[in-house]
UniProtKB/Swiss-Prot annotation:
<dbReference type="Pfam" id="PF00562">
    <property type="entry name" value="RNA_pol_Rpb2_6"/>
</dbReference>
<dbReference type="InterPro" id="IPR037034">
    <property type="entry name" value="RNA_pol_Rpb2_2_sf"/>
</dbReference>
<dbReference type="Pfam" id="PF04560">
    <property type="entry name" value="RNA_pol_Rpb2_7"/>
</dbReference>
<keyword id="KW-0808">Transferase</keyword>
<comment type="subunit">
    <text>The RNAP catalytic core consists of 2 alpha, 1 beta, 1 beta' and 1 omega subunit. When a sigma factor is associated with the core the holoenzyme is formed, which can initiate transcription.</text>
</comment>
<dbReference type="GO" id="GO:0006351">
    <property type="term" value="P:DNA-templated transcription"/>
</dbReference>
<dbReference type="InterPro" id="IPR007644">
    <property type="entry name" value="RNA_pol_bsu_protrusion"/>
</dbReference>
<comment type="similarity">
    <text>Belongs to the RNA polymerase beta chain family.</text>
</comment>
<comment type="function">
    <text>DNA-dependent RNA polymerase catalyzes the transcription of DNA into RNA using the four ribonucleoside triphosphates as substrates.</text>
</comment>
<keyword id="KW-0240">DNA-directed RNA polymerase</keyword>
<dbReference type="InterPro" id="IPR007120">
    <property type="entry name" value="DNA-dir_RNAP_su2_dom"/>
</dbReference>
<dbReference type="InterPro" id="IPR015712">
    <property type="entry name" value="DNA-dir_RNA_pol_su2"/>
</dbReference>
<dbReference type="GO" id="GO:0003677">
    <property type="term" value="F:DNA binding"/>
</dbReference>
<dbReference type="Pfam" id="PF10385">
    <property type="entry name" value="RNA_pol_Rpb2_45"/>
</dbReference>
<dbReference type="InterPro" id="IPR007645">
    <property type="entry name" value="RNA_pol_Rpb2_3"/>
</dbReference>
<dbReference type="InterPro" id="IPR019462">
    <property type="entry name" value="DNA-dir_RNA_pol_bsu_external_1"/>
</dbReference>
<keyword id="KW-0548">Nucleotidyltransferase</keyword>
């Protein structure tokens, strides 16, 4: 595969042992695909499949009026163009959505005619609300913020069988139950009680005997018994009787009487157990019937009603037990043949028969009435109501829907194959079969279902969740329409009079705005974005709750293999409930997770890839990805490690059906970014995966020297980099945009052959980190489709770069790295390695108040000129101003009501005039503890209010930028067109032209160069066809110009119209501050292996331990953090990183020395590096210039990839270390023989440490838990209303609570005065604290403590309990 534009600049050497059979699929495909099928916007209405919006509409329409004379039919829907694009919506705080219009048809029938005929039809497009659109990266912009809809893992619709594990009854008996779960509608449960009676319940209501349900669906006791039991046939004699002999029913039974053959010989003696030999003897004796004594019949249960043949009356009922009296009645009625139920204690229980005895209903109607009474207690059961309710429970498509998944699961579980034939409601057969399977389970046949099996849990994606909400909105609309349809005829209404779109908009808005599954996007870095979109949650509406979820649901299940990551899940209460999709996983049409496998054909592993769901997988034997294969693709070993039905085993190659696609198949994106994951303990790997998502983007991203090869995929798929949509040549590039002239073969005729990429500059993310894109192409570069043109936050040359490569030494250092603390060199801070930029958004609104409008102005009294000189004439801060806490950003004054004035104020007013007093200063100021630079200001003005100068200048800048884009496009299009025209004209004969060109002359290049290009069109060519081509070219150019003018005009209109602001708001101003955060003690840092710590000290570089050549370590970590945590991956990463940097230094040495800096030497060394181990790279396909550029980029480290579960071995690391540090270098640097440790020297004394230390490079991250965000101090601030104590927390500018235990501590020390001060004047003694403030101002430091307010609160509370408590003052 050829290298892409960015790949060949810095090739990552991979240690993978096997070639990739399949690339990692597009990581956001699930989200994008799901929403695409929901909208089907680009599909013509006639071709739309019945899913998403189409399905929702067709399930509700047509709506028929109560009298049936009018109906509203749905024809089609269309989605309009969104008014604002994504960026504009984010700036203005709007939702990125497009208007939905449905074409509906109102059909009125004629009342007068006997058979229904159509009187009139009205068709109209009706507005149905706005549907939010997904951005290209799988998120939604709702009210200006980016949100993600997380997929939900819920229990699949279908039928499930389980037991209570013996927990319900004290005896520990297993009580079996079955549950039919529809997609929407009532749940139907069946359950056994401890007495083996079978009950059913609907929607978890009161339970009733299951035979009531069977009678309600039209069965009689006889047919019920016939369905569930086999019969024994008896012939009654005057004494005793004859039973039909069925051998298998007698085996293992105890003989209760002598069984004799026809010849009178005893075959089985009384009280002997009947065995196989007895049965053979009986068969040989040709016994058809066995004579039984009278007692043998007692206790048996009749299978059918027995009717007296003469009178026709019922002598005995089905399900009656045979007693003496029943037998004598039967004999009296001359009945010879009877049938009884065949039951035994082992595997034919009499459960249904017992249930039938507890059931008192007589017939079908009575049964349905009983069900009605359970569902609607207290309502009178009329016949119609009873029928209607029963139909609506399980048989009506409006109220009950199994869905395609549910029907498929029901059919496959009840043994009808996996097709989805059958209605989407329940049928009587379904109910009967379910009960039958449940009885079989109780009889000991069959298996219960595993609820945590991924074949029984499915994923609801964005599209499906949105469709459910949309349907809910439509149902509300349907009710309103039904009522109004009756009037449609009389009042001559149109469809839009009937439909009110408010309920739909409300349902959609509620879902996207406040549903539990609609989450504020985690945008700390590209990885956290991508992980958030691939998350699968078991919580949410219709899912589990944290409190009720047990251990089993949270645990890793064998079916997670390749579908859900076993590592990445949060620590804490959500553990195991929130998961991440595995790298290669995808959803099938039913919403079940599938994972790819390579098919094995005739013993050879082929490249054919099949996706299997958890259910399908259980039928196959699947080999691991690391099984050894020969060149033909056959297994080398006699026994191969495989998985079958969740168990691991060794088996012969001939039995294997499939093989894993890749070793990284089982983990998620975040876990697949951890090198040497296979050497880390699972708990630490979990922390490592989670902490990568919290890494703050550094100022200068640096690629990890030790990666896994997934970095490029993540960076590109996350959408933070800019990819070329079409190939071409870079025409212009600057910090803000890249302009590309598209290749002719990729350009569609009639379209502009120019792509302009406007880069995102210094934009705030959801987590206040900085998003900024930097171009990495130069003018004249050729790029192909999909190449990376610009890096985003945390990406370096198109690869994910979350942290920095640091030189690590594992050694204790004066206790500064005790218990996971981290010692860092000052050089790291000085080089700005971990400096990050955070962007804060501060907003101020000017409202219309009762006393008049608030005003944004520079004219504020009592403000020093130093404060005002940052503001422009409109009272808004300049861009580029550096501000600190309490500086004014936007001047604002609010009118205040007239108050009683003190004499002094009256005097002042009399002297200085009115104006100064009737407004108060409510300006926007920088919050405490913040220092930064203003990088952007946005002004939003309500329609009808005059814009200030600042707002106008912002609009002018935006328009200038847009015009520049259009001019660039036009320039390139015109240049292309004129180049073609020039080729057409040169050498042609003319009839005349500008500058007195004579007839018959030929056109030369010099003549054309002399003319203005637009004059070329005035040349009259002699050749007619060419003249036509010239005319067409002129027309097309003029048309392009006209199109661009229209586009500019539209943009201008959009920008100059007033902004939509909340009611009562006149102006809104947003100021963006860029805050630079340097690394400091207290910041949290971590590696990728869960090795986290807090910076304890930043040490001068001269004090750090250094190597023999004087190189100081960047970070010193405690070696004791490794063994107990068992994350050895970090040590291997350090070794390999050490090799990577060493190889880079060797390349740098080669390039420095003129003798070795020739291309062939460089090629030879690179070949050694890239092609001694691993899969190898094609360095020889690169040109000499490309090889030298590659070498330049490799100078500070060759990037290595050690894929998960397929990484570098110890030998390979050793080989690389030898390449990196030849003997003379190793000697000079005082490395040990293994080259993994070095002798270090103490920076302060210069002495050698007493033993060598492991050194090397590790990719280390700075996490989003910064001490700046957490530190906070308060002098004076707000107090709580009731207790009058200071509030708590940084957000409230609160104090530090001096709690119960702290009071005890001071009591223990006897520090009475300190304690008094803490509990009174520093807390809630109101008069005392005011007095102290006065005293401090006067310079007199005296405390006058009084009564704390909380004591008064206590007294009041005691009084509220009607206990009169008073203070006695003396």
């Amino acid at each position: 595969m050829p290298y892409s534009y960015t790949e060949k600049k810095r090739i990552r050497k991979s240690f993978a042992k096997r070639e990739d059979v399949q690339d990692v699929p597009f990581l956001l495909a699930t989200q994008l695909q799901s929403y695409l099928t929901f909208l089907q916007a680009d599909t013509p209405p006639s071709d739309r499949a019945s899913e998403g919006l189409q399905a929702a509409f067709s399930s509700i329409f047509p709506i028929v009026s109560h009298n049936g004379m009018a109906r509203l039919e749905f024809v089609s829907y269309v989605l309009g163009e969104p008014v604002f694009d994504v960026k504009e919506c984010q700036q203005r705080g709007l939702t990125y959505a497009s208007p939905l219009r449905a074409k509906v048809r109102l059909v009125l029938l004629d009342r007068e005619v006997s058979k229904p005929t159509i009187k009139e039809v009205k068709e109209q497009e009706v507005y149905m609300g706005e549907i939010p659109l997904m951005t290209g990266t799988g998120s939604f912009v709702i009210n200006g913020t980016e949100r993600v809809i997380v997929s939900q893992l819920h229990r699949s619709p279908g039928v499930f069988f389980e037991h209570d594990r013996g927990k319900t009854h004290s005896s520990g008996k297993l009580l079996f139950s079955a549950r039919v779960i529809p997609y929407r509608g009532s749940w139907l449960d069946f359950e056994f009680d401890p007495k083996d009676v079978l009950f059913f319940r609907v929607d978890r209501r009161r339970k009733m005997p299951v035979t009531i349900l069977l009678k309600a669906i039209g069965m009689t006791p006889e047919s019920i018994l016939a369905h569930f039991f086999d019969f024994d046939n008896f012939e009654l004699k005057s004494e005793g009787g004859m039973i039909e002999f069925v051998p298998e029913r007698w085996k293992g039974e105890m003989a209760r009487f002598d069984i004799t053959g026809r010849d009178g010989n005893v075959i089985v003696e009384k009280d002997k157990r009947i065995n196989a030999k007895h049965l053979r003897d009986m068969a040989n004796a040709n016994i058809q019937r066995v004579s039984v004594p009278e007692e043998f019949l007692y206790g048996r249960v009749l299978a059918k009603n027995i009717v007296d043949p003469d009178t026709g009356e019922v002598v005995a009922h089905a399900n009656d037990e045979i007693t003496e009296s029943v037998l004598s009645a039967l004999r009296a009625a001359n009945v010879r043949d009877i049938q009884t139920l065949y039951t035994n204690d082992l595997d034919r229980g009499p459960y249904i028969s017992q249930t039938l005895r507890t059931d008192e209903t007589a017939d079908q109607m009575a049964a349905r009435v009983a069900i009605y009474r359970m569902m609607r207690p207290g309502e009178p059961p009329t016949e119609d109501a009873v029928e209607a309710l029963f139909q609506r429970l399980f048989y009506s498509e409006e109220t009950y829907d199994l869905s395609r998944v549910g029907r498929m699961k029901v059919n496959s579980r009840l043994g009808r194959g996996e097709d989805i034939t059958g209605p989407m409601t329940l049928t009587n057969e379904d109910i009967l079969e379910t009960i039958k399977v449940l009885v079989e389970l109780r009889n000991g046949r069959g298996q219960i279902d595993d609820i945590d099996h991924l074949g029984n849990r499915r994923v609801r994606c964005v599209g499906e969740l949105a469709e459910n909400q949309f349907r809910a909105g439509l149902v509300r609309v349907e009710r309103a329409v039904k009522e109004r349809l009756g009037q449609a005829e009389t009042e001559n209404l149109m469809p839009h009079d009937l439909i009110n779109s408010k309920p739909i908009s409300a349902a959609i808005k509620e879902f996207f705005g406040s549903s539990q599954l609609s989450q504020f996007m985690d945008q700390t870095n590209p990885l956290s974005e991508i992980t958030h979109k691939r998350r699968v949650s078991a919580l949410g509406p219709g899912g589990l709750t944290r409190e009720r979820a047990g251990f089993e649901v949270r645990d890793v299940h064998p079916t997670h293999y390749g579908r859900v990551c076993p590592i990445e899940t949060p620590e804490g209460p959500n553990i195991g409930l929130i998961n991440s999709m595995a790298l290669y996983a995808r959803l099938n049409e039913y919403g079940f997770l599938e994972t790819p496998y390579r098919k094995i054909i005739d013993g050879k592993v082929s490249d054919q890839i099949d996706y299997l769901s958890a259910i399908e997988e259980s039928n196959y034997v699947i080999a691991q990805a690391n099984a050894a294969l020969d060149d033909e693709g056959r297994f080398v070993d006699d026994l191969v490690a495989c998985r079958e039905a969740g168990e691991t085993m060794l088996t012969a190659p001939a039995n294997v059906h499939y093989m894993d696609v890749a070793p990284s198949q089982i983990v998620s994106v975040a876990a697949s970014l951890i090198p040497f994951l296979e050497h880390d303990d699972a708990n630490r790997a979990l922390m490592g995966a989670n902490m990568q998502r919290q890494a703050v983007p550094c100022l200068r991203p640096e690629k990890p020297v030790v990666g896994t090869g997934v970095e490029r995929t993540v960076a590109v798929d996350s959408g933070t980099t800019v990819q070329a949509l079409r190939g071409g040549v870079v025409d212009h590039v600057d910090a803000e945009r890249v302009v590309i002239r598209v290749n002719d073969d990729e350009n569609v005729a009639g379209e502009v052959g120019v792509d302009i990429y406007n880069l995102i500059k210094y934009t705030r993310s959801n987590q206040n980190t900085n998003i900024n894109q930097r171009p990495i192409v130069k003018r004249g570069d050729k790029v192909a489709k999909g190449d990376v043109l610009a890096d985003g936050a945390s990406t370096d040359l198109g690869e994910l770069a979350l942290g920095q490569n640091m030189l690590i030494a594992f050694m204790p250092w004066n206790g500064y790295n005790f218990e996971d603390s981290i010692l860092i060199s000052e050089k790291v801070v000085a080089d700005d390695r971990y400096t990050s930029i955070h962007i804060e958004e501060l907003t101020v609104v000017a409202r219309d108040t009762k006393l008049g409008p608030e005003e944004i102005t520079r004219d504020i009294s009592n403000l020093a000129e130093t404060q005002l000189n940052r503001l422009d004439d409109s009272g808004i801060v300049y861009i580029g101003a550096e501000v600190t806490a309490d500086d004014v950003l936007v001047g604002k004054v609010t009118p205040k009501g007239e108050t009683q004035l003190t004499p002094e104020e009256k005097l002042l007013r009399a002297i200085f005039g009115e104006k100064a007093s009737d407004v108060k200063d409510t300006s926007l100021r920088v919050p405490s503890g913040m220092v930064g630079t203003v990088i952007d200001v946005q002004v939003f003005t309500r329609e009808g209010i005059v814009r200030d100068k600042r707002a106008q200048s912002i609009i002018d800048d935006e328009l200038r930028r847009y015009r520049q884009d259009l001019n660039d496009q036009l320039r390139i299009v015109e240049n292309d067109q004129f180049d073609r025209i020039e080729k057409l004209l040169i050498g042609k004969t003319v009839n005349g032209g500008p500058r007195k060109l004579a007839k018959g002359a030929t056109i030369t290049k010099a003549y054309l160069a002399d003319l203005d290009r637009w004059q070329w069109f005035d040349i009259r060519l002699a050749d007619e066809p060419h003249a036509v081509v010239l005319e067409q070219a002129k027309e097309s150019l003029e048309q392009k110009r006209h199109q661009f003018d229209l586009a500019f005009e539209e943009k201008r209109k959009k920008l100059t119209q007033g902004d939509e602001l909340p009611p009562g708001v006149l102006k809104m101003i947003k100021v963006y501050l860029a805050v630079k955060r340097r690394l400091q003690p207290g910041d949290k840092m971590a590696g990728r292996h869960g090795n986290k710590g807090v910076v304890s000290r930043i040490t001068p570089v001269e004090d750090m331990p250094h190597m023999a050549d004087g190189t100081p370590a960047d970070i010193v970590l405690n070696p004791l953090g490794v063994p107990s945590r068992m994350n050895v991956g970090q040590v291997l990463e350090v070794h390999l990183g050490w090799a990577a940097k060493g190889v880079g230094h060797r390349i740098a040495d080669m390039l420095r020395d003129e003798r070795t800096a020739q291309v062939k030497n460089v090629r030879a060394y690179l070949d050694k590096v890239y092609n001694t181990t691993g899969t190898g790279e094609q360095i020889d396909t690169l040109t000499d210039d490309e090889v030298m550029e590659l070498a330049q980029n490799l100078k500070n480290g060759v990037p290595f990839a050690t894929p998960v579960f397929d990484g570098a071995t110890e030998e390979e690391i050793g080989k690389m270390l030898e390449l990196a540090y030849p003997d003379e270098v190793a000697k000079r640097m005082q490395l040990t023989d293994s080259r993994t440790q070095a002798w270090l020297f103490d920076g302060r004394t210069g002495e050698k440490f007493e033993r060598p230390v492991t050194v090397g490079y590790m990719h280390y991250l700075k996490l989003h838990h910064l001490v700046d965000d957490k530190m906070h101090a308060r002098s004076t601030g707000p107090y709580s209303l009731v207790t009058q104590q200071p509030l708590g927390g940084k957000a409230q500018f609160g104090g530090q609570r001096f709690g119960e235990m702290e009071v005890w501590a001071l009591e223990a020390y006897g520090a009475a005065y300190t304690l008094q001060e803490m509990l009174t004047v520093k807390s809630d003694d109101i008069t005392g604290r005011t007095k102290v403030y006065e005293n401090i101002v006067k310079g007199d430091h005296v405390i006058d403590a009084g009564m704390p307010e909380s004591f008064n609160v206590l007294v009041k509370e005691i009084r509220s309990l009607a206990l009169d408590m008073d203070l006695e003052r003396n």
